[in-house]
Regions:
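Cytoplasmic membrane-interface "Motif A"-like loop-to-helix N-cap segments
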Residues: 68-83
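Intracellular juxtamembrane helix-capping segments at the cytosolic ends
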Residues: 113-127
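Juxtamembrane intracellular "pre-TM" segments in multi-pass secondary transporters
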Residues: 1-10, 188-224
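C-terminal membrane-cytosol helix-exit motif in multi-pass small-molecule transporters
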Residues: 149, 153-154, 172-191
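Helix-loop boundary and gating motifs at the non-cytosolic
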Residues: 2-54, 218-229
Length: 229
């Protein structure tokens, strides 16, 4: 890690913590409880909203990933997706329930597409020798984020905060912990990669990669499982 600034690495790790706070508290627990228990929606309707977001991510994700891999500036794209997630999370419950569900879908899309860009920044905070280790450290920080998110949300609920106030608190936590990434991460330059790729081209690449992956036993099952995870 001698060729990577510690501030750059730590900021990258903090971003994993930040988005896991969101993932654990909002889609993982509190939004579904608020929507079903307090707003009278069914689990099936919530599942449809979540599936809608995931379909959009599945279509646009390869394009975002290809653009981030080939772009010299990944942080602006990460900023846009993160801002979309934070703002829509902060506004959950502010308007009527249908608008809140739409905001929830936007937050899920922003979170998942942001994760694609975030993963592409791994090359900027690691080298070939320690990339696996750094990636594992990111996962560890993610677990810390889940504990922080659960602890803060539970505490706020116990002292009488409403679900809407918890949503806003999570959005603020996401903003605080993600901010260093936009300030301190030093991006490495990428050479000879196309950054102005079209969505149709990215889907073609995915199909070719999928066919190629079938040559490796177990890889297809792993990719399917990772997608649903």
């Amino acid at each position: 890690m001698n060729d990577v600034k510690q501030s750059s690495l730590f900021s990258w790790l903090l971003f994993d913590l930040a988005n896991t706070v969101y993932a654990f508290v909002i889609p993982g627990l509190y939004f579904s409880v608020w929507l079903v228990s307090e707003q009278g929606w069914t689990d099936q309707a919530l599942g449809f909203a979540t599936s809608s977001a995931m379909i959009i991510v599945a279509i646009t994700g390869p394009w975002v990933g290809a653009r981030s891999d080939g772009s010299q500036g990944k942080k602006p794209l990460l900023f846009i997706t993160t801002l979309a997630c934070i703002l829509s999370t902060f506004l959950l419950g502010t308007f009527n329930v249908n608008t809140s569900v739409l905001l929830f879908i936007i937050s899920l899309i922003g979170f998942n597409l942001g994760s694609v860009v975030y993963d592409a920044l791994l090359i900027s905070v690691s080298n070939e020798k320690n990339r696996g280790k750094i990636s594992g450290m990111g996962v560890a920080f993610g677990y810390i984020g889940s504990l922080i998110g659960f602890g803060v949300a539970t505490y706020l609920q116990n002292i009488g905060y409403s679900y809407i106030e918890i949503f806003r608190s999570v959005a603020i936590l996401f903003m605080i912990f993600s901010l260093p990434a936009f300030i301190f991460i030093d991006e490495k330059k990428v050479s000879s990669l196309k950054s102005n790729i079209k969505i149709s081209e990215s889907l073609t690449i995915v199909i070719k990669s999928w066919k190629h992956s079938r040559k490796y036993p177990g890889l297809t099952r792993f990719l399917i499982g990772r997608f649903f995870y």
